[in-house]
Amino acid sequence: MSITPSKKSELISEYRIKEGDTGSAYVQCAILSERIRNLTEHLRIHKKDYHCRRGLMVLVCKRRKRLQYIKNKYGSDLYLDLVKKLGIRDVFH
């Protein structure tokens, strides 16, 4: 359910804005999206894992807040580009 360090570094290198960027909102959204995908797969198998389901909802809310921050700070174009890149729905447009 967690992300391996190699997968995390791969996501960081793919979504970073500049060299050495490991904590921008773009990178955080990418890491959160991967964690959400992992938990979703886990919940397909273990349908009654309510503790995990709550954790999933917390991660979804965190990602939504980060996406809203990106849209407000950087504009709709970069936000829509990130949403398309991550393969998630646009909830603010």
UniProtKB/Swiss-Prot annotation:
SUPFAM superfamilies from the UniProt entry: S15/NS1 RNA-binding domain
Key words, A-Z: Ribonucleoprotein, Ribosomal protein, RNA-binding, rRNA-binding
Protein's GO biological process: translation
CC terms in the record's Gene Ontology section: cytosolic small ribosomal subunit
GO molecular function: rRNA binding; structural constituent of ribosome
Pfam hit, one: Ribosomal_S15
Gene3D superfamilies: S15/NS1, RNA-binding
Domain of life: Bacteria
Keyword Ribosomal protein: yes
HAMAP family per the UniProt record, alphabetical: Ribosomal_uS15_B (MF_01343_B)
Family, as annotated: Belongs to the universal ribosomal protein uS15 family.
Complex formation: Part of the 30S ribosomal subunit. Forms a bridge to the 50S subunit in the 70S ribosome, contacting the 23S rRNA.
Primary role: One of the primary rRNA binding proteins, it binds directly to 16S rRNA where it helps nucleate assembly of the platform of the 30S subunit by binding and bridging several RNA helices of the 16S rRNA. Forms an intersubunit bridge (bridge B4) with the 23S rRNA of the 50S subunit in the ribosome.
Family matches, as PANTHER family: RIBOSOMAL PROTEIN S15, BACTERIAL AND ORGANELLAR (PTHR23321), SMALL RIBOSOMAL SUBUNIT PROTEIN US15M (PTHR23321:SF26)
UniProt-recorded name of the protein: Small ribosomal subunit protein uS15
Source organism (scientific name): Anaplasma phagocytophilum (strain HZ)
